[in-house]
Amino acid sequence: MPDSLPSDSVGLVSPKTIHFDKPLELACGQSLESYDLVVETYGKLNADASNAVLICHALSGHHHAAGYHSLDDRKPGWWDSCIGPGKPIDTNRFFVVSLNNLGGCHGSTGPNSNNPETGKPYGPDFPVVTVADWVASQARLADHLGIQQWAAVVGGSLGGMQALQWSLDYPDRLRHSVVIASTPRLTAQNIAFNEVARQAITSDREFFEGRYYDENLVPKRGLMLARMVGHITYLSDASMGEKFGRELREEAYKFGFDAEFQVESYLRYQGERFSETFDANTYLLMTRALDYFDPAYDFGGDLSKALAPAQCEYLVLSFSTDWRFSPARSEEMVNAMISARKRVSYAEIDAPWGHDAFLIPTPRYTDIFTAYMDRVAREVGA
């Protein structure tokens, strides 16, 4: 952490918890009688509440998207490169809202929250949630904040799915939908990766069928393996080759099965760190929400028909080396938007970092994103 905060940082921020008493009906047929959402906001809401931007997070994301919680923080929020004064989502112009979704493990109601009916953590009794459920809860959050219409709803990866869902479920409540490194539905391969991750977690002997809280345990090894598998899919072959190659940790082979290659050590480190901060039941929920996302499902697989209600303008961005959600998946969305006669701008960004490229401020990505959000700001007089 530097001695002073960067001039383009939103600075020190504090999350707040908002409680909702009205029951939320879920796609699975169950309901949450009450729930909490943890939120951070950056910038100021203008007089007519027209300059608000919603940030939707990806699988392992949360509400802390920008700035610092204390001067001792080593790193800022997960999308600090794009949120702040003079950045693509300029907090001198926009009021930015970022939340931890339902089912999360960073303060919003989820599996590690106490079930009011039992006084114990929900664990596996927490209902399965979908992208549409998240969007419904976010709409209530907008109501609470006095925001009738978002200037833009923005998200990368799973967050992009939420930005797309917003345009279908609440078409008059957003002007722009920004969908980055995302997909209109998972391929069989993506579902398979998620299933391997879930099996890694549920087969951990300390999982206890999701009731590990009662045992004061964490299925750490399962979480580690799940994260290691996921992390491989977030990087490109080229970026892994450039960063690690076949470099050894020491000068010679050890002829054993400990981590000898630098890439092995890196994956173990990432898995270990993740297992210390993330909840296993939340990981299961998030991956299942990914699997279920398919707006075209009720329209015979025709995405252009699913898009019929949309009124907003879209920005869709993909990255050349993203093989988790490849440019072909973004092009599928764009073609459907064009067929549905929607306004859409699209760019494929040449970047070597795979799926994680949406988190890295490369010049062309930043320029396109900034130019688009500048137009959004001018439209609402921000």
Curated annotation (Swiss-Prot):
PANTHER family in the record: HOMOSERINE O-ACETYLTRANSFERASE
First-tier enzyme category under EC: transferase
Entry similarity comment: Belongs to the AB hydrolase superfamily. MetX family.
Organism of origin: Marinobacter nauticus (strain ATCC 700491 / DSM 11845 / VT8) (Marinobacter aquaeolei)
Coiled coil: none
InterPro entries in the cross-refs: AB_hydrolase_1, AB_hydrolase_fold, HAT_MetX-like
Residue numbers annotated as active site: S157, D322, H355
An annotated GO cellular component: cytoplasm
Annotated compartments: Cytoplasm
Protein name as annotated: Homoserine O-succinyltransferase
UniProt keyword Cell inner membrane present: no
First-listed, main subcellular location of the protein, grouped into a coarse class: cytoplasm
Subunit-structure text: Homodimer.
